[in-house]
UniProtKB/Swiss-Prot annotation:
GO molecular function: potassium ion transmembrane transporter activity; symporter activity
Protein name as catalogued: Probable potassium transport system protein Kup
UniProt cross-references to Pfam families, sorted A to Z: K_trans (PF02705), K_trans_C (PF22776)
Entry GO terms, CC: plasma membrane
Subcellular localization, as worded in the UniProt entry: Cell inner membrane
Disulphide linkage map: none
The keyword Cell inner membrane is assigned to this record: yes
Main location per the UniProt record: membrane
Coiled-coil blocks: none
Amino acid sequence: MSHTPKSAGSSHAPANSQTALVIGAIGVVFGDIGTSPLYTLKEAFSPHYGLTPDHDTVLGILSLVFWALMLVVTLKYVTVIMRADNDGEGGIMALTALAQRTLPGGSRSMYVVGILGIFGASLFFGDGVITPAISVLSAVEGLEVAAPRLEPFVVPITLVVLGMLFLAQRFGTERVGKAFGPITLLWFFALGAIGVYNMARAPEVLHALNPWWGVRFFAQHNWHAVFVLGAVVLAVTGGEALYADMGHFGAKAIRRSWQFVVLPMLTLTYLGQGALMLRNPAAVSNPFYEAVPEWALYPMIVLATAATVIASQALITGAYSVASQAMQLGYIPRMHIRHTSHSTIGQIYVPAVNWCLLALVAVAVIGFGDSASLATAYGVSVTGTMLITTVLMIIYARANPRVPAPLLWLFALVFLAVDCAFFYANIIKFLDGAWFPLLLGLILFTLMRTWRRGRKLLHDEIRKDGIKLDTFLPGLMLAPPVRVPGTAVFLTADPMVVPHALMHNLKHNKVLHERNVFLTVETLQVPYAAAGKRLKIDAIGDEFYRVHVRFGFMETPDVPLALMRSCDQGGIYFDPMDTTYFASRETIVASANRGMPIWRDKLFALMHRNAAPATGFFRIPGNRLVELGAQVEI
């Protein structure tokens, strides 16, 4: 997951490189949607929906599944949404940044778009809990078909598989990741082969490709058909990954993978399961494994487990990536990030995210107990994210003069209707399990909003009580303190105000360094900062400098490296072994009389206290950093 957008997406890449990207995309991007056949039709015919697997109902459900894949994935994501790239990057955070750029800065509408983006990212993490749980559990449930006596061991085996997966994250996926594409490719061909095997025995199932059967299903079942969409949407879960991983593999490779491999194989496997149910209605108990020939059952269970582990791995890696972006954009506190590859910057491991996901996934597996129960909880976070993506796309496209207004309104009407129908079909299952991912999303949304608001209040308080740098320095130099050799770098969020760390240094040590740099780090709403805009240096006299460093939200801030570059661009003498970094470490004091409600003030104080220090986040050597404390009331 490390290709830069330009290399990944280049249309002039060599054929062997494009083939590698296609296979890589199949392994990472399509793992989630590729494991949906394990449980989609099983859920559609579960007692929860009260459907009987007669001829018309089977064809109706199959038609809805096929056209959901065509409308939501092929038309919406592959054809339209993937055109909205933020310098090659996709995903809901990137689309939020694009939509905000079309709105007046500081406006109410820009604020609302930011809220939508945060909530969409929060729902993504809810999806990140359900996907590994339901995928691996569905695969292991094949043991119930092969040997019913093993049913009591399904949950323990699932927990062991998931535990090993999360424990292995710290070692990175660089080596095993190379096998993801071929294994998932084998999985898709196995899906297609099983589909053809069963379709040959009931070729009339091909009639389901006619949308008339889907329309007929709605005509026969009225509002109950909308309710059934809660199961149909399981077929398109993972569609968001096509857009989210666009920066890693490029739009071209993802489109080719979908058109020539994934869509045909998914269509064949769903039709194959439908053909089986037409011949044997009792197969609805687990149509995926019932469709597998008896001799291939155990190998298929192993392959399915491998495919679901790969799907889970892709989502876990995506969670790390989104968390890293959210940190860079200031939505969540800094956390320790480990780079698991010497050659690939994008391969990271975030321990806090990993252990939180493991705990929540284990709770989901134990609490729900089987894939049928988890399926009722699954769709709401996915459909919520899809709906928010559509709204953000409409806002972004509105400002694009190349998009004709009639085409935009057609897109809005069709996909708002589709997404709202899917979301409604899942939200009405609130008491049956949909509350779980919504609760997770709401908790994360509250944390992100509290952190964002708390940081602004903290910045405002520091600025209010601060002294203007331009008036402080001339007064200081009237009676200059003793200057000692070396360079002092003061990290500051506001380059116009005297940093607390400088004031403390003067108060307690009564010295100034030979050179003093006021360094501000800014994260842009683009994935990668352009070379010409990365660094800005202002010399303000007497060996004082303002240095403004910009990073994209996909980059890892490296302050020492930025200062090395400042030697060439701004003439600042910089010796890493002769430089001391100073940072303020504020202690938050919650107050009931200002800012946020007292409970949010206390929550922010707790988050701030547990945030990772700047040392690791900005790649500052620990033996070169001095942190000075300050109390701030918010």
